[in-house]
A protein has these predicted regions:
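Primarily recognizes the serine-hydrolase "nucleophile elbow" in alpha/beta-hydrolase
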Residues: 152-195
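Serine-hydrolase catalytic machinery in alpha/beta-hydrolase-like enzymes
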Residues: 59-72, 77-147
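Loop/turn elements at helix/coil->beta-strand transitions in domains of secreted/extracellular proteins
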Residues: 79-81, 108-111, 150-153, 175-179, ...
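Alpha-helical scaffolding within the catalytic cores
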Residues: 96-102, 183-192, 217
Length: 256
C-alpha cells in the first residue's frame, strides 16, 4: 500500500500555496481568529494514579489514538516536565515510538504525550480548529491524572505539519505551554495570543518539501520582530527530524 507522504498530502489537498503564502514575513504570525475550540483547559494537579514506566496507548480513540510515554526515571515524588509531540501529515504517533528517542527524554524524566490527529493531518491545517484540540485536551487530562507534572515545564512540539500545529497551538495556549519545539514547520497561524513562549525551531537546509527559505527563515524573522524568544538551528539535511536536533531541542526546553 502506498503511504501518504507530506508532499502527496499537501499537493492533493491544495495546501501547498497556503504553506508558503502564509510565510511572507508580514503575516507569518498573523492572528487568524477562530469562533471556538482553540483553548486547552486541562491543567496539572495531584495525580490519582501511579503509572508503570514505558509506552502505553492513550486509550481515548478508536482507530486513531496515540501514546503516553512514562520514562523509567519518573517518580511521583518529584514533578516532571511534559512534552506533547505531534506527527506530520499522513503519519501517526507511532512514528515517534521507534528508535532511541526515549533515551533523550529519560535523562530529564520527561513525560511525553503523543496524540494521533483525528484526520490525516491536524484540524487547523484544514482551516478549522476543534476536534484535535479537544482530543489533545483529553490526552493532557489523562497525563495529569497519572503523572505529577511541573506546570512551569510543559512544552508542545512536532514535525512538519505537527510543527506548524505546535507553533500555532502553543502561541494560542501560551498560558499552558512555556516552550515550543518545532521541527521543519510550514507556517504559524495562532487563533489568539496568550503570551510569548520560548521557541526552538530546527530545519534542514536541503528540505524540498517545506523549503527553509519559504518557511522557517521567514517564521523566525517574523517571530523575532514580535519579540518572541526564538532559538533557530539550521542543519545539513532534508525534510527530517534528527536525533541531534531533538537532543538540542530538549536541552533548550530544560534551559541548558
Amino acid at each position: 500500500m502506498h503511504q501518504l507522504t507530506r508532499r502527496d498530502f499537501v499537493q492533493s489537498a491544495g495546501l501547498s500555496i497556503l504553506a508558503t503564502a502564509c510565510c511572507k514575513r508580514s503575516d507569518a504570525v498573523a492572528i487568524q481568529p477562530a469562533k471556538s475550540g482553540v483553548m486547552l483547559y486541562s491543567r496539572p494537579g495531584t495525580p490519582t494514579e501511579n503509572p508503570e514506566p514505558g509506552l502505553h496507548p492513550l486509550g481515548l480513540g478508536t482507530g486513531r489514538d496515540g501514546f503516553i510515554y512514562v520514562p523509567p526515571t519518573y517518580t511521583p515524588l518529584q514533578a516532571s516536565p511534559l512534552l506533547v509531540l505531534m506527527h506530520g501529515a499522513g503519519q501517526s504517533a507511532r512514528e515517534f515510538t521507534g528508535g532511541s528517542l526515549g533515551e533523550i527524554f529519560d535523562k530529564d524524566a520527561i513525560v511525553v504525550v503523543i496524540p494521533d490527529s483525528r484526520s490525516p493531518t491536524w484540524d487547523m491545517i484544514y482551516g478549522e480548529w476543534g476536534p484535535d484540540v479537544r482530543f489533545i485536551d483529553r490526552a493532557l487530562d489523562l497525563a495529569f491524572t497519572r503523572c505529577r507534572i511541573d506546570p512551569n515545564r510543559i512544552a508542545v512540539g512536532g514535525f512538519s505539519d505537527g510543527a506548524t500545529y505546535a507553533l500555532s497551538l502553543g502561541i494560542t495556549n501560551a498560558n499552558l505551554f512555556h516552550t515550543i519545539l518545532a521541527f521543519s514547520p510550514g507556517f504559524v497561524q495562532p487563533a489568539v495570543k496568550t503570551g510569548k513562549p520560548r521557541i526552538f525551531i530546527g530545519h534542514g537546509r536541503q528540505d524540498e518539501i517545506l523549503p527553509i527559505d519559504l518557511t522557517s527563515r521567514e517564521i523566525v524573522a517574523a517571530l523575532k520582530e514580535k519579540n518572541y524568544p526564538v532559538k533557530f538551528e539550521e542543519f545539513d539535511g532534508n525534510h527530517t527530524m534528527t536525533r541531534e536536533e531533538v537532543s538540542h531541542a530538549v536541552d533548550f526546553f530544560m534551559g541548558r
